[in-house]
């Protein structure tokens, strides 16, 4: 399902993260909002950088099980949980105001969401939902240094300038989150497991749809003109193709093999 959190009375921000985050993102959208509806494809080919990092033996991380030949190849390859990893952003032609504070849950070895796109100046509140402490920090971010965060505790941080910021956890090395501070983002949403999405639009105008994964743009930018009525995109937005995915997988495997060889030589 799709969720909205309000920017004052405007209700411009949409997040489709499902029932598990109803308490996180708050109020319903304005009844006057139009919606841009569409579908993503190729998302099962996306590869979270955490997986590639885990293959490096020098990190002493977890390892993947041997492939089972009786299982179909497309199920033997990891694929992302796009309802919180793949963010669909609606970009306006002018800078947007920051919305009210956004709650990010930290639990189960991950954050919810994993990638988020917000205007600079948006206050993010990180809440620990695990029964043990976390030590979040921002990579190369002097204003977000490691600090203990116990069960239920909250911690706030605001991206002041445009850019991409990575959040990690000293207590859980596989936890990685990406915050994209984009001045023109007017609304965001997260797709269903089938890739379907609906993003709300409060003001008519010219917009651009752009998907983000692991802090980076994926797929082509799609121009959209919104009037009073909903817009249904006929063509699916491809966020990854097989050729590129295979090339990235090959490069990852070669890097892991090289690291393993160097490790054995020590």
What kind of feature is each model-predicted range?
Residues 1-11:
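N-terminal secretory signal peptides that target proteins for export/translocation
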Residues 14-26:
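Bacterial N-terminal signal peptides
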């Amino acid at each position: 399902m799709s969720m909205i959190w309000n920017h004052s009375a405007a209700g411009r921000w949409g997040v489709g993260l499902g029932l598990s985050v109803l308490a996180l993102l708050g109020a319903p959208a304005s009844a006057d909002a139009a919606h841009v509806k569409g579908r993503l494809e190729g998302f099962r080919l996306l590869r979270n950088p955490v997986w590639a990092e885990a293959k490096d033996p020098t990190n002493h991380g977890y390892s993947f099980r041997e492939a089972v030949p009786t299982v179909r190849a497309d199920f033997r390859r990891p694929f992302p949980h796009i309802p919180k990893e793949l963010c669909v952003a609606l970009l306006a032609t002018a800078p947007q105001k920051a919305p009210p504070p956004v709650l990010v849950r930290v639990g189960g070895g991950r954050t919810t969401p994993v990638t988020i796109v917000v205007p600079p100046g948006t206050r993010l509140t990180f809440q620990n939902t695990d029964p043990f402490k976390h030590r979040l920090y921002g990579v190369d971010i002097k204003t977000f240094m490691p600090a203990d965060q116990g069960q239920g505790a909250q911690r706030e941080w605001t991206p002041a300038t445009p850019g991409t910021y990575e959040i990690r956890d000293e207590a859980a090395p596989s936890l990685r989150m990406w915050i994209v501070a984009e001045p023109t983002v007017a609304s965001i949403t997260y797709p269903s497991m089938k890739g379907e999405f609906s993003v709300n639009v409060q003001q008519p105008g010219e917009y651009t749809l752009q998907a983000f994964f692991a802090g980076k743009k994926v797929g082509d930018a799609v121009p959209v003109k919104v009037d009073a009525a909903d817009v249904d995109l006929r063509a699916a937005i491809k966020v990854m193709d097989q050729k590129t995915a295979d090339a990235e997988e090959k490069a990852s495997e070669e890097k892991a093999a090289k690291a393993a060889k160097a490790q054995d030589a020590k």
